[in-house]
C-alpha cells in the first residue's frame, strides 16, 4: 500500500487500465468524428474555395439570403 494514496499496486493498475481505456475511446471517437466531418466537407480549399453557400442545405441558404 502506498502511503500517499492508500491504494495497493493492483488498485493502481486497475485505475491505470481504466484511464487508458477511456483515453483510447476518446481518441477513437474523435478520429471517427473527424473522418466523418472530412467526408462531409473536406477541410482543404479547392480552386473555387469552400464557400458555405455551395455546400449548405437549402434551408441554410435561404436564411443567408
Curated annotation (Swiss-Prot):
Q: Which residues lie on this side of the membrane: Cytoplasmic?
A: 1-17
Q: Give the keywords, sorted.
A: Antenna complex, Bacteriochlorophyll, Cell inner membrane, Cell membrane, Chlorophyll, Chromophore, Light-harvesting polypeptide, Magnesium, Membrane, Metal-binding, Transmembrane, Transmembrane helix
GO molecular function terms here?
Answer: bacteriochlorophyll binding; electron transporter, transferring electrons within the cyclic electron transport pathway of photosynthesis activity; metal ion binding
The processes (GO biological process) annotated in the record are: photosynthesis, light reaction
Supply one GO CC term from the record. plasma membrane
Name its cellular compartments: Cell inner membrane
- Taxonomy, superkingdom: Bacteria
The protein's predominant localisation is: membrane
The residues that hold a bacteriochlorophyll are 16, 34
Which residue stretches are annotated as topological domain Periplasmic?
Answer: 41-65
Claim: Transmembrane is one of the keywords in the record: yes
Membrane topology, record value: Single-pass type II membrane protein
Question: Transmembrane stretches, by residue range?
Answer: 18-40
Known function: Antenna complexes are light-harvesting systems, which transfer the excitation energy to the reaction centers.
Homology family: Belongs to the antenna complex beta subunit family.
Q: Please describe the quaternary structure of this protein.
A: The core complex is formed by different alpha and beta chains, binding bacteriochlorophyll molecules, and arranged most probably in tetrameric structures disposed around the reaction center. The non-pigmented gamma chains may constitute additional components.
- What is the official name of this protein in its record? Light-harvesting protein B800/830/1020 beta-2 chain
Please name the source species: Halorhodospira halochloris
Amino acid at each position: 500500500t502506498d502511503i500517499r494514496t492508500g491504494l495497493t499496486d493492483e488498485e493502481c493498475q486497475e485505475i491505470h487500465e481504466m484511464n487508458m481505456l477511456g483515453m483510447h475511446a476518446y481518441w477513437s471517437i474523435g478520429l471517427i468524428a473527424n473522418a466523418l466531418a472530412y467526408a462531409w466537407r473536406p477541410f482543404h480549399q479547392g480552386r473555387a474555395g469552400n464557400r458555405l453557400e455551395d455546400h449548405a442545405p437549402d434551408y441554410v441558404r435561404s436564411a443567408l439570403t
